[in-house]
Amino acid sequence: MVIKKGISRVVIGSLDPNPLVAGRGIRKLKENGIEVKIGVLEDKCKEMNKVFMKYITSQRPYVVLKSAMTIDGKIATVAGKSKWITGKEARLEGHKLRNELKGIMVGVNTIIADNPELTCRIDKGRNPIRIVVDSKLRIPLDAKVVNDQFKNKTIIATTEMAHKGKLKLLKDRGIDVIILEAKNNKVDLDRLMTSLAAR
């Protein structure tokens, strides 16, 4: 299209790391007499495309860690409560992340302790796919993430140690369950990342 339209100069921020592309487009532009400038605002372009670049170079999802802790470095109060240990502004930032990212992942203990919805509460926000890491399928059948109107956006990652009857009940509800080989009696997070990236 660029060649057919008679464009004489093309400015490229950063090269596409996709090995299937491998600079062929740039070569074709140059062969057709088009001036090509590469690397303009390269760092900003790479930052803007970091999610794609991570996936295309590693076949892994781009992961952002969001955590909260009390002033003494704990993730829960003395009573074991972890809900609302952050302020309103921090919670809003968390919901902005949920809106921007494709998925949110928690361990089953978070589901058992807090029964969170893991939805985006920003007006007109987009709900992420909810991923629960649960090696032995201990998720309560009354958990919000497997019962609410967004249950079709829930993935449970488990192992062959999962209770087969519970597995069937969850699948019958339309819950997406990934069964992975266990590593040290837990979900192998390395394999989980590979599986999630392939979706």
Model-derived features: positions:
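Zn2+-dependent cytidine deaminase-like catalytic core
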Residues: 1-45, 129, 155, 160
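Short, flexible helix/strand-to-coil boundary loops that buttress conserved ligand/catalytic motifs
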Residues: 14, 49, 79
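Active-site ligand-binding patch in enzyme domains
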Residues: 54, 64-71, 75-199
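Charge-rich, low-complexity amphipathic helices
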Residues: 24-25, 32, 50-52, 58, ...
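Proteins enriched for Cys/Gly/acidic motifs involved in redox and nucleic-acid/cofactor modification
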Residues: 40-68
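Short Asp/Glu-rich motifs
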Residues: 21-22, 48-49, 189
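Hydrophobic, well-ordered secondary-structure segments
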Residues: 26, 42-49, 91-98
